[in-house]
Amino acid sequence: MITTKNSIRTLALAGLISIVSSCNLTELDINTDPNRPASGSLGLLLPLAENAARNAFTAINSDAMGFAGLWTSSDSYNLSNTSYQGTWNGAYQNLQNMEEMLKATEDGKNPRYRGIAMVLKAYSMGNYVDMFGDMPYTEAWKGNAATPNTSPKFDKDSDIYEALIKLCDQAIVELAKAQPIAVINDYMGAGNATTWTRIARTVKLRLLLNSRKGRATGNAELKAAFDAGGFITTPAQNWTYLYSTQISPERNTHPWFITYTGTSDPNYISHQLMGEMILNKDPRLPFYFYRQTTRILDQNNPTDRGSTPFGGSYLPLRDSFLDEYKKAFGITGAIPAADLGYIAGFFGRDRADVSGVAADGPLRATPGTYPAGGVFSDRSVAAASLTGQAALNFGGDGQWPLIHSWNTKYYQIEAILDGTGVTGDPKALFIAAMREQIAVVVAQGLKSDPSRAKTPVAAEIDAYVKAWTDLYDAAATNQAKLNVVAKQIWFCSWGQGMDIWNLQRRTGYPIQSQFKQFSVGIQAPISKPPRQYALRLPYPQSEGALNPNASKFITDVIFDRDPIFWDKVKTKWEF
């Protein structure tokens, strides 16, 4: 597995880099021996650049999950020109690390560092273009140049994509060259050229998949990339960012683990996500979510009634869900009290519930072992509020799945079913993708909470996979099959917001549908959102005061009307 750890060494380097960066870091002509180039400064920059790529993954991970209906972060689409000022500024601050590496390797003496920086830049900038569209690129990062440019032009999103695709190819060329001195402080690829070449090919594949409908040669180039191979295909090759249980001198636990410290309440998780995983007997359920309560809120108690989720959506009292539950588990008559208490632990909200926030933090379901490194929570584990539970604040060694083997299998399935010319057996790929993602989830749980977590019985996984392949087989057309696959990707996307948001914008799938067992769609918002589905992020108002070239983008581009160049679907929800 390709992993990266934000270790103590990386954190300690941050202050040093801020000092070194103020010097003329790129002047490597101080070397007197051309056969022994000075790579120390590059070794300091590399972990920062890798963390910057992590930041490109997490920048709007939560909101993208909300756009997709996985939890409540920005799921009402009430966005404005002040919503993402920090995201915009962070993009250019993070990418500066990669720019410094590229400047420092222009002399050709450190090709592997250069290739790595190119890969990280292509991945990161690709994510930001998927968020905002047109952005400063060719004239960016020149504020401190000999001839400063503090008002860079905005490049077209399609032009940036072309440059990033070429950047991946250039990275592969650089990585094939001999590196005189070993690469140091590489927490993602251990300085291995083969590993980084594989990541470069995978990033290129992702860029080609996203942009295929917006480029004249999109399908042909995507097919060529799949035919060429060399991208991530096995779990051992997964590109993953790992956290640890370290809390001193700097906390290095997974960001979602903050709930376990008792200092922050979790987002409301989608009732549909949790409820359908219950009904579908999804083996990932106890790894995804931790239950804090078994108490069913008393509707005769004003306080409990005020904490009850809006509009009859509360699962233990939701008749439509309980009817589905009885069918799924073969229950005749009343549902046992123990079952209702178990269901009560999956306390969240329906999509686009904009009602006020109650004092319900100790009731909310919270992220479990995957990806947060939290606590496993099956029926045998007693639910307990995290407030004041120091005994549960022991983990946090979670992960972010940057790009995994199951992602690339889903990429291939989409390409096959959507008629791009890419070949393969989509059903076999679907089965493999499900099994590989489940295995990652289980492994994380066994690592983070070994005393509680249990490996699912093989027959349970087999039954689950068969149920979804049966849905796939029953779908009459390739587009219907792609929708089934997209709904499974939705379940897989717990912790991976950008990929599911991109999928919805590329394909329009999963479709809008009801909340029930083995539904192949996403439920409609429970209340009408103030805006439509987010096709992109709004440009930050603050940028207009800094760069006059931004003004027209701030005023003329509407986030729920104007798509990214590759989005030909323009997803809209029926309210």
Positions of PLM-derived features:
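C-terminal functional modules
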Residues: 409, 416-420, 435-575
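Sec-dependent bacterial lipoprotein signal peptides
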Residues: 1-21
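Structured, solvent-exposed acidic/aromatic patches
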Residues: 40, 69-120, 124-440, 478-480
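Short coil/turn segments at secondary-structure boundaries
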Residues: 61-65, 290-291, 497-506
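Membrane-proximal, proline-rich intrinsically disordered regions
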Residues: 23-75, 82, 87-92, 100, ...
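Short, compositionally biased low-complexity segments
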Residues: 21-28, 66-74, 133-141, 448-461
